[in-house]
Amino acid sequence: MSFISEFKEFAMRGNVIDMAVGVVIGGAFGKIVSSLVGDIIMPVVGVVTGGVNFTDLKLTLKEAAEGAPAVTINYGSFIQTMVDFLIIAFCIFCVIKALNTLKNKLPKEEEAAPAEPEIPADIALLTEIRDLLKK
């Protein structure tokens, strides 16, 4: 089997395609949440906290010099990213909780009792002989 045909077989499996769709949708969802946080939630939080723009919050370690930018720790961007993460984690939690609730409400299939294995002929014959000797 050639390398190309093996790759084609691998890529066309259902699980790989499902995973690819999930990654694309997850990326789009992440962009939506980032926009929600950056454009809607954080400005409101900034107004509530006295007009603070979180993306401008930073700690300057070294001032800018000729030809070199300032060295800063941008903790405001980190706060915004943490809010993104919390919203995404909460949404995923809600989806999983809803799926588990639906899964628990569906009637469970009763497991069939395992069939007794067929007794080999020699064992059946020995059992018969034992029973006859007991009489």
Curated annotation (Swiss-Prot):
It holds the Pfam family MscL. It comes from the Bacteria. It is found in: Cell inner membrane. GO terms for molecular function: mechanosensitive monoatomic ion channel activity. Keywords: Cell inner membrane, Cell membrane, Ion channel, Ion transport, Membrane, Transmembrane, Transmembrane helix, Transport. Gene3D superfamilies: Large-conductance mechanosensitive channel, MscL, domain 1. InterPro entries: Mechanosensitive_channel_CS, MS_channel, MSC/AndL, MscL_channel. The chain crosses the membrane at residues 10-30, 76-96. GO terms for cellular component: plasma membrane. Its main location: membrane. It is a multi-pass membrane protein. SUPFAM superfamilies: Gated mechanosensitive channel. Channel that opens in response to stretch forces in the membrane lipid bilayer. May participate in the regulation of osmotic pressure changes within the cell. Belongs to the MscL family. Homopentamer. This is Large-conductance mechanosensitive channel. It comes from Campylobacter concisus (strain 13826).
